[in-house]
Structures are given as C-alpha cells and as structure tokens.
Amino acid sequence: MPSQKFENLLNLALETSMEERDKSLELNVGYEREDNTWELIVKYHGDLRQGMSSFFALPQRRLLQIEELIAGYAIMTVPESFVDALALVEEIEYIEKPKRLFFETLQGKLASCIVPGSQLGTTLRGQGVLVAVIDSGIAWRNQDFRNTDGTSRILYLWDQTLQAGQIRERAVESGLFTGENSIDYAPPDGFYSGVEFNQAQINAALNASSEIEGNLLVPSLDTSGHGTAVAGIAAGNGGTSGDVYAGVAPESELIIVKLGTPRANSFPRTTELMRALTYIVRKSLELRRPVAINLSFGNTYGSHNGTSLLERFIDNVSEIGRNVICVGSGNEGASGGHTGGSVGITSNTTAGTSTGMASGASNTLVELIVGNYESGLNVQLWKDYVDRYRIRLISPAGESFTVDTDKAGKQTYVLEQTRILLYNGEPAPYLTSQEIYFDFLPLENRSYINSGVWTFELEGIKTITGNYTFYLPSETVRSEQTRFVRPTPDVTLTIPSTASKVITVGAYHAALEAYADFSGRGYLYQDRLGGRIEGSFIKPDLAAPGVGIIAPTRAGTYEPVTGTSFATPFVTGAAALLMQWGIVDGNDQYLYGEKVKAYLRKGANPIRGEREYPNERVGYGALCVSASLPG
C-alpha cells in the first residue's frame, strides 16, 4: 500500500514488478538486484540509529547501512523487505529514491573581467581558499594541478567508483606495497564506498619510479575528461601552457570527488552527490578554510521549485561553514523536453469549493513526438493540486484512455504495444503541487515503445490557476527525435540548480556577446506551481562564458569545450577570489554564501540583446569579477 511518507516515484517503484522496472529509465535507480536492496534518501529528526534499532535484530541486518550526512539527512541501504516498515519509524520524516545525474556537456577570463596584471591577475589568485570539484574525476598528473616544485595541489581525492578491497589486492599482487610502503585503501570516515587519497599519497604516486607504479598507488582515472576540464577552468594554473590557459583561481588548493559508483555502465546518482557535499563541507571545517564548490550536472525529474530532498539538503549545506555552491543551469534550453501553459480558469468557482462551469477553460492538446527505437520513456505532468483536470492519453494509432484522476496511486494501461504505468500523486509535506507520472514501457514481446505522435488532452473541470507543466528525461537518454511538438524553453534549468541558495549559472557566447540558446532557463516574477515566485528567488543568478572554452584535457593538452558545465567553474573560481579578498586577506570575514551571490549579481555586466535584468535567460547578466569586488 502506498505510503505518504514516500515520494511518488518510490511508491510506484515498490508497486511495480522487477521485470517492468528493468525496462524503465527511472524506476530501478537505487535498486541493487544482487543484494535485493534499495538505496534511499532519508530526512529525519532525533536519533535515527536508535529509531532503527529493531531493524538491526532482523536476519538481513548485514545488508542494512546508515550513512548520516548533515542537517538531518541520511542515506540508507536497506533490503527491499524492510522498506515498507521504514514508514513506521517515527524519526523518519520523508523518503525519496535516488535520481540519475547527467553531466551538462555540449577567451572566458577576459570576458569575465579577470585581467592579467590587475589585482585579480596578481594578488587575487585563490590563495588560502579551497576549490572543490564534484565531477568525473581529475587527471591528477596534469601540470595544471601541480605546484612549481612538482607537488600536487590536490589535498584530497575521493574516487567513489573504486573498491578498496580490489585495489588492495592489486597492490599486494604487484609486490610494491610491503612494510612501510603499504597503503591502507579505504573510504573516507563515515562512508562505505570508494577510496580516499590524500596529498601525500598523490605526491608519492607522482614521484614513483614509473607511471605504471604511480597508477598502482593512485588508480583513479578521469575517463571522460569532463572533471579535468571543469577543474582546469576553475583552478588550473596553466602549467602546461605557460600560464596562457590558467584558470580563474590558479593558486587555490583542490578537493576532488569523482562522482559515481562501482556499478558498470551506470550514471551517477543524487545520493552520491549528497555524500560528496557532506564530505567536502566536513573537510572545509576540519581545515578551517573557505570552500567554493562546483557542480556541473543535473537532471530533469522534479517540480523544479526547490522542494525535493536534494534541493533542500543543498540549501542546508550552504549554511554550514563558509562555502559557496555553484551549479550549472543545464543544457536543456533547446532540447524540446519541456512544455507548459494553462488550460484556463473555470468560472463561478471559489478556491477549494464548488465546481462551476468552464467559461475560461478549454481543451488543451499537448503533443509529444516519440522517435524510433525508444526502449522506454517517462513523462512528468505537474499541476496545482487544487485544479481538477480530465486527462486523456491518445496513442499514435488513435487508441486512448482517460486517467482516473479521483484514484490516487498506481494505474496501468495498454495502448497499442506499449504499457503505461501511471502514478497519480498527492501533495507531500514539502510540496503543494501534484505530479502525474507516466512511464512508457514496451510489452513483453517488444523491445521498443510505439513511435509517432502521442497526445495528452487536458480539460479543466475546476481550475483555480489552470497552470500545467510537462518534463521529459534529459536529452542525454532519449533520441534526438523525441521531443514536444510545441516546447517551451522557460523553466528548463536542471535540478539541483533550482535550489534557492546555490549560485545558478547560465551560459553565454562571449565572442558573440549573446545568450547561448542551449542554456537552461529559469523563472522570474512569474506564476509557478505553489503561487508567485518571491522577488528574491530568481534563476539563473548570472551567466558566464560557455561556448568554445579552452580547457585542459586528461592527455595534458588543451581543447575547446562547450556547455553550462564549463560556464559554472568561471563562477566557482570567481567565488574563490572573492572569499580570498574577504576572508583570507581580512577585508570581510563574512564574504561567503549568499553575500558572494549578491556581490556577483551586483557586478554583472549587460549582454547584447538582453533588455531587462534580471531575466530568465541570464539572470543579472554576465559575470564580471572586478566589478563584483567591494570598493
């Protein structure tokens, strides 16, 4: 039976067979078939372990893990047979399953007012500030991340994808690590996964007699090069280029988290991001140093209004210690994965009471093109809970069903050769809007869902706001042809850039001085689910160069990269410079968090073609660090 303590997606997953979950892009995220366990995000109060004490007496207790994070959040790994009982634990307030994260990949320093020879190019170089990059790892041998004496600028590297036991076995087999040379490979304190390397271990690997020996000492690789490029833009020293391609904060020291899991062929999860943020903030507090944190990835699942556990967790993290968290707005602006509008407002209605006649409301058709060879697809429909709709889904061949909107929970339908799992959600303790979730799966004898134009017909029965919005999965996991016929680019920023207290970064083309159309758009003084947006809740906050940015590669060279992934580290590096000026240099001990955001907003430059500021494309304008410094 569905629990109101569980999010909609978790309820649907638990009510769906393993065979059907395997066909879904989303429902099995967090489930481990080998152990029959779920990884879950938990919001709790009080003593969680005490509240869970009875579970540790059960036969399957060996599979139970609790990782307490910060601010009343935890990640739990539990046998599937335990999950329903979690709803009875008084200390647990709410539970969500993980979501997948996608890297946002598709002459910035001068455009961002960081001029060589100025104060920003000489005295402000990130000294005394930590730059933390949560990404695909780093090419730790690269000269861009080493001091002039050859030692590493990386203080800590946590590779979440490595397994300590396997690395230890290889080390023993190699014959290199005996006696005083042995290394105790282990996760960071308080965590169960991955391997942590410190600066001394990285330096030992750099000084090894051969590259092979060094790679045995620190077997962490950035296989995509994404994290290396991001770290280079934020904090590389341009060592391979003679400082020509130095990053924004080239004398900062680094904390790197390679996001992921030992599972093969899998995307990173939101749970791994939450672990990474907890780890970095704890290190910052331990080292008593300010930290600028860079996140260059996101996903499209959620209401996009800052209410998910991940978004609220990040807002809580931003208030611990002296940190700034910078997040890219994503590359979904022109992907066709979002649409929205209004079915109109019915007449003779009083909020929460009578139904009335629909004079202002009308039937609305939302058409979705599904490309060939889609093995599965999910669609989110978000609406105001007070509004009542009649919703009909029509297949490409004209078959249809009408959603039973009076029945909460799971519903199952079949149109043509496609099974549709539907979950009619309810409000949650942290969410006033309603989600209706559709998961399109091929029938047992097919590999793909039906292609063609699928139509959602919306009819307002009693509508107070009439607003609706649809989201598809990230363009990374759907075919190029799959998109809405009439997409809307607004509110296409990805989660977690929707968190209130992060600095959300869009991208612009510095050479053309123009907004980059792929950059995820936000919202500004407009109606959205749950009411009007507060004036202070504006996304994105500003934009940075994100097209053709020269960045270091894992091979030790440089190449151009494009995407909000590579706009974000400009702002992360800028935050490090402001915190150096304020905290390290003693000009303002309180220059972190929202104060850095305010200064960067105030110093932003106009962008060609943008008439009003702030706006939903570039926020307050283009990053300009020199104008953001006080005085």
Mark where each language-model region is.
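Subtilisin-like serine protease catalytic core
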Residues: Q119-T271, R288-R289, I320-R322, E374-L377, ...
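Short acidic, glycine-rich surface-loop motifs adjacent to enzyme active sites
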Residues: P98, I154, V257-L259, L277-N305, ...
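Extracellular S/T/G-rich loop segment that most often corresponds to the catalytic His/Ser-adjacent loop
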Residues: Q160, F191, A200-I202, I320, ...
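Edge beta-strands of jelly-roll/beta-sandwich modules across compartments, strongly enriched
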Residues: I436, T463-E475
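Hydrolase catalytic cores
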Residues: A231-A234, G242, I255-P262, V281-V291, ...
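Autoinhibitory N-terminal propeptides
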Residues: M1-G72, P79-G121, L130
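C-terminal subdomain of the subtilisin-like protease fold in secreted/lumenal serine endopeptidases
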Residues: G30, E286, P290-N299, G306, ...
